[in-house]
């Protein structure tokens, strides 16, 4: 059973209804998008409710000038006391299918570098930011 179930890449009301219904039927933790928000235009206070916890979403990987380090600094400048702040990443390997079909080629590799950068870990530790898994939400 997956830790969570979501589909932020597609923006269709019917799609989100179907995703939520499927998650309910199969007892999966569902994470949609904040009402009235699109995946590429989330406002800084956009959140979803996951098991009674406000989850504030940050995803800028589809923006032309995307820089995960800059996104992290935005998140750190706007931390929320009433929930958790979550950056959404798409790191991973690049295979033939992804190379031919994905619009996230550069962001994928940039996110791998960012997520494995010891300076990022040190910055979060310095600020006493606790990293949690989605299972904990």
Label the predicted regions:
Residues 19, 71-75, 120:
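A general structural detector for well-ordered alpha-helical segments in enzyme core domains, enriched
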Residues 5, 87, 124:
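Conserved, mostly hydrophobic/aromatic
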Residues 74-95, 130-132:
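Aromatic-lined glycan-binding groove of carbohydrate-active enzymes
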Residues 98:
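Substrate-binding/catalytic groove segments of enzymes
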Residues 30, 101-137:
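C-terminal domain-boundary segment and adjacent tail
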Residues 9-14, 57-78, 111:
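Active-site glycine- and acidic-residue-rich loops that bind
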């Amino acid at each position: 059973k997956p830790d969570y179930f979501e589909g932020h890449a597609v923006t269709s009301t019917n799609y989100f209804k179907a995703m939520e219904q499927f998650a309910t039927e199969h007892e999966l933790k569902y994470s949609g998008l904040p009402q009235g928000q699109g995946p590429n235009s989330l406002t800084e206070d956009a959140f979803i409710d996951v098991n009674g916890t406000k989850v504030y979403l940050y995803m800028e990987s589809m923006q032309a000038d995307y820089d995960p380090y800059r996104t992290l600094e935005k998140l750190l400048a706007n931390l929320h006391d009433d929930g958790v702040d979550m950056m959404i990443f798409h790191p991973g390997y690049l295979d033939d299918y992804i190379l031919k079909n994905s619009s996230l080629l550069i962001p994928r590799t940039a996110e791998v570098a960012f997520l494995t950068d010891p300076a990022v870990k040190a910055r979060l530790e310095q600020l006493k930011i606790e990293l949690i898994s989605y299972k904990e939400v």
